[in-house]
Amino acid sequence: EPSAWVGILVMLATGIYMIVQSFRLQLTNADDTRFVVNAVDTVRTNRMLLTDVNTGKEILSWTGDLFKDVISPWAVFAAYLSKITGISAASMMHTFLPPVLLAVMMCIFWLIAGELFDKHIYRSLFVILLLVMYMYGYFSIYNAETFTIIRLWQGKATMAAVGIPALLYAFLRLYRLLPDDRRWKEKTVYNAEQKGAIC
C-alpha cells in the first residue's frame, strides 16, 4: 500500500538525518579520550587495559575509573574491530561505529514495532516517533538520547541505544511465543486449587 512506502521513506530519511546529526554533534572530551586511548593502546601493545590513559604509565592496580573500564571492555571490542579491519581505533570509534550502531538501533526499533503493530504504516510511524524523541531528547548530557547522538561509540551509550532495546525486543518476542496466556493461567489456578494451595 502506498502510505506504507511513504512512511518507510520518511523513516529512512529521518534515520539518515539522525546519522548526519550524530557526526555534526560529536562530543570529544576527557571521557571520550579514555575510551579511544584504551582502544589505541590495546591495538598498539596487544595487551588489554594495562596503560593508565591519564599518565601513559603501566597500571599496577585498577582503581576508580580504571576499574570500571576493566569490567566493561567495550574499548577492547573497538580495538578488535580496528585490528581485523586495519582501520585506526580512533577512526573506527568516531567514523564507522556511529552509523552502523544507529542503523542497528533503527532495525531493533523496527523489530519492536513489528511485535506491536501489524501494518507497515504503524511500524514506520512508531520508528519515526522514537527517532524524533531521540533527536529532541537532547536536554541533558546524561540521558540516553544525548549519549546516542553525541557519543554512540562509548559502551554506555551503545548499551542504552542498542542493548536495552534489543533486550526489550527479546522479551516481547518471547512473550509472543508463550502459549495462550489465559489458558495457562486457568490451568495453573485449577491445578493449585486441586492441590489445596488456594483457599
Residue ranges and their predicted role:
Residues 159, 164-195:
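Membrane-interface transmembrane helices that cradle and orient dolichyl/undecaprenyl
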Residues 15-137, 141-154, 158, 162:
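Active-site lumenal/periplasmic loops and adjacent helix-entry segments of GT-C-fold
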Residues 1-2, 113-117, 170-179:
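Structural signal for the C-terminal ends of transmembrane alpha-helices
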Residues 4-8, 121-127, 193-198:
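Membrane-interfacial loop-to-transmembrane alpha-helix junctions, especially the N-terminal start
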Residues 1-21:
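Start-transfer (signal-anchor) and selected internal transmembrane alpha helices
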Residues 63, 150-154, 189-199:
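Glycine-rich, flexible loop segments associated with nucleotide phosphate handling
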